[in-house]
Amino acid sequence: MKTDDFDFSLPNELIAQLPLANRADSRMLYINSRQSDLRDAAFKDLPAYLKQGDVIVFNNTRVVKARLAGFKSTGGKVEVMIERILGTHQARALIRASHAPAIGSTLLLENAITVQVEAREQDIYTLRFIHSQPLIELLDQYGHTPLPPYIGRIATASDESRYQTVFAQETGAVAAPTAGLHFDETMLTTLQTLGIKIAWVTLHVGAGTFQPVRVENINQHIMHTEQYHIPTETIEIIRRCKAGGGSVLAVGTTSLRALEASALIGDGELVAGSNETNLFITPGFQFRVVDRLLTNFHLPRSTLLMLVSAFAGIETIRHAYQHAVNNHYRFFSYGDAMLIEGDSRS
């Protein structure tokens, strides 16, 4: 299958640059893949599509302030985007500079942090932070909110809260699980009042989520790896839901990938505990856990667009995205949502 099959034209003005004043005011495009049903709705309508006994699974990862600016020892400017935290003083990162820093060289970030460049693998550097404070504390003190590259502005103080879900708990992501950004406390309370069960997973979203697929044949793409955790309680909630005839709604592609990666390891059964995954979901994938998906609109030629095409069907997603463009939906991280009733057909 070709990467070109997942390309589409998107006017720049449809890329949301700012969040809405209220989280839950987004629009929502409802897609029933099995019935070829496409419906314009509001995110606040979500409870009407669920029933008592259904489960909604959230990713409770917390975004760290992963962007740092500074200088090379030669004086050239650098911008560092943490891709993954490896330990107390070590991380993998993307580095933007006029000339790539040499292995063994040092960087001075935010006029406070000395960093040694230890290794490089393609575009990813391994960095060691030479400081008495743990890396997590340094990022919280000196870092900046890692807004995606398609948001063409500098992060503001409001982004610290708005580019974070209201239920964020487990620190480690360098990008937000954006489908979760639509939920406010009122919506969470409403869902629970209606008897909708809430379950949690953790998947620490890496910067690789924004990378386009650069190969012509999607089967040649090398997927980035992310860490995830599935609690035993979540598995029990999902088992009871399935046994009672309920459906499982994954909030975001990250929640879906964590669940489906776990089920793949367990030969159809969810496996509790922590692991990492480079699962690349493309059309033809057999979904074992998730029945419904709430997700934002994704970038052309991206692995996430391929994932939703696998979940809903390629032609269904093409039609839905064209409808969204024609009707001026807002795209990407701060944009609107889609609620998809799954279809394993490719």
UniProtKB/Swiss-Prot annotation:
The record's subcellular locations are: Cytoplasm
A GO molecular function annotation here is: S-adenosylmethionine:tRNA ribosyltransferase-isomerase activity
Recorded catalytic activity of this chain's protein: 7-aminomethyl-7-carbaguanosine(34) in tRNA + S-adenosyl-L-methionine = epoxyqueuosine(34) in tRNA + adenine + L-methionine + 2 H(+)
Q: Which Pfam families match?
A: Queuosine_synth
GO cellular component terms given for this protein: cytoplasm
SUPFAM superfamilies per UniProt: QueA-like
Q: Which UniProt keywords apply?
A: Cytoplasm, Queuosine biosynthesis, S-adenosyl-L-methionine, Transferase
Instruction: List its EC numbers.
Output: 2.4.99.17
One GO BP = tRNA wobble guanine modification
Please state the pathway this protein functions in, per its UniProt record: tRNA modification; tRNA-queuosine biosynthesis
Which superkingdom heads the taxonomic lineage of this protein's source?
A: Bacteria
The signal peptide annotation in the UniProt record is none
Q: How does it assemble?
A: Monomer.
User: What's the name of the protein?
Assistant: S-adenosylmethionine:tRNA ribosyltransferase-isomerase
Species whose genome carries this gene: Nitrosomonas eutropha (strain DSM 101675 / C91 / Nm57)
The opening ranks of the lineage are: Bacteria, Pseudomonadati, Pseudomonadota, Betaproteobacteria, Nitrosomonadales
- Gene name linked to the record: queA
